[in-house]
A protein has these predicted regions:
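Feature captures hydrophobic
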Residues: 1-192
Length: 192
């Protein structure tokens, strides 16, 4: 039986599984898996440059919506919520279920295929230009995002600094392991 998102049981089970994966999975972690998201969260929480650039009154989350890409082992949509707050505080970066997406009208939802997210992470696609060109679909107030260009660019820069292995760099065996991991975690934690 899957855990119910937002409950203490969910939180406890998710954190336990996350700690097991951090301890047991080989590094570099695969980008967008929970253990990598935790590394990214910690990095952003301690990044002085991001804190310096962040807007003092920012109270918005950014939801990264990654659409399915079976060729990379991704059979389901994944939603990653970056809970960002005043002066560069990063409260968390983690998976959320689709049912939670858009509940807060201040949240920004950016949707793209995983290969577009690879391009963003590798600095081959500027996140703001990508939104303006329709390569990344934004749901939210574009003028507010445009005001936050510098912190947004810094967030993208941190992806490369955290490091990790992109799904298009995986061997066929690693791709199948990635697929199995996602196909196990999402239903178990009520994320599909």
């Amino acid at each position: 039986m899957p855990y119910t998102y937002g409950t203490p049981e969910w939180e406890e089970a998710y954190n336990k599984r996350l700690q097991e994966r951090i301890a047991n999975e080989p590094k570099p972690f695969i980008i967008f898996l929970p253990e990598w998201l935790k590394e990214w969260e910690k990095y952003l929480q301690n990044d002085a440059k991001y804190k310096e650039l962040a807007l003092p009154n920012w109270e918005n989350a950014i939801v990264i919506h990654i659409t399915p890409a079976p060729q990379f082992g991704l059979d389901h949509d994944i939603f990653v919520r970056m809970d960002l707050w005043h002066n560069g505080e990063c409260r968390s970066i983690r998976y959320i279920p689709k049912s939670e997406v858009g509940k807060n009208p201040k949240d920004f939802i950016i949707t793209a295929s995983i290969d577009r997210w690879f391009a963003v992470g590798r600095k081959q696609l500027d996140v703001v230009k990508g939104m303006m060109q329709g390569k990344l679909k934004l749901k939210g107030d574009l003028p507010t995002v445009v005001k936050a260009v510098k912190p947004a660019v810094r967030i993208v820069e941190t992806v490369g600094e955290v490091g990790g292995k992109y799904e298009d760099e995986l061997t066929p065996e690693e791709t199948e392991k990635f697929r199995a991991t996602v196909n196990e975690l999402l239903p178990e934690f009520g994320l599909v």
